[in-house]
């Protein structure tokens, strides 16, 4: 079990190392996926601040949002709207070691529909 956790952490760090070069120019859209909810935030690594954030726990969704793909897509759209309000349109997608499939893919597509470019 610990070997799987170690491999997952290595995959995430390898992904972030590649993104470090690109995130100097553009902010990073970071995704965290739990068993109950999905969280995303746009991070400006040069200043070390979170520019915009959204999750399936937001008041906008009430109690209806959860772990499904549709909720992830809505979180992506909400994050894109908040990022555009903050003046961000171009980001680097940090999937955090997660496979680009299912909820992570739905969040990315929702953010693209909302107007983010990556």
Curated annotation (Swiss-Prot):
Gene3D superfamilies hit by this protein: 3.30.420.100
Q: Name one GO biological process term.
A: translation
Q: Which InterPro entries does the protein's record reference? A: Ribosomal_uL18_bac-type, Ribosomal_uL18_bac/euk
Q: Name one GO molecular function term.
A: 5S rRNA binding
Which terms are listed as keywords in the entry? Ribonucleoprotein, Ribosomal protein, RNA-binding, rRNA-binding
The protein's matches in CDD domains, at most eight in alphabetical order, are given as: Ribosomal_L18_L5e
One GO cellular component assignment for this chain's record is: cytosolic large ribosomal subunit
Which Pfam families does the UniProt entry name for this protein? Ribosomal_L18p (PF00861)
UniProt family annotation: Belongs to the universal ribosomal protein uL18 family.
Q: How does it assemble?
A: Part of the 50S ribosomal subunit; part of the 5S rRNA/L5/L18/L25 subcomplex. Contacts the 5S and 23S rRNAs.
Q: What the protein does?
A: This is one of the proteins that bind and probably mediate the attachment of the 5S RNA into the large ribosomal subunit, where it forms part of the central protuberance.
For this entry, the protein name equals Large ribosomal subunit protein uL18
Organism for this UniProt entry: Parvibaculum lavamentivorans (strain DS-1 / DSM 13023 / NCIMB 13966)
């Amino acid at each position: 079990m610990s070997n799987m956790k170690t491999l997952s952490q290595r995959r995430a760090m390898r992904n972030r190392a590649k993104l470090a070069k690109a995130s100097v120019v553009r902010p990073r859209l970071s995704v965290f996926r739990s068993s109950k909810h999905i969280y995303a935030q746009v991070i400006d690594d040069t200043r070390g601040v979170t520019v915009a954030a959204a999750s399936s726990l937001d008041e906008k969704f009430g109690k209806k949002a959860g772990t499904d793909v549709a909720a992830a897509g809505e979180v992506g759209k909400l994050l894109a709207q908040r990022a555009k309000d903050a003046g961000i349109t171009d980001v680097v997608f940090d999937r955090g070691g997660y496979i680009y499939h299912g909820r992570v893919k739905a969040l990315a597509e929702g953010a693209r529909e909302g107007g983010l470019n990556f």
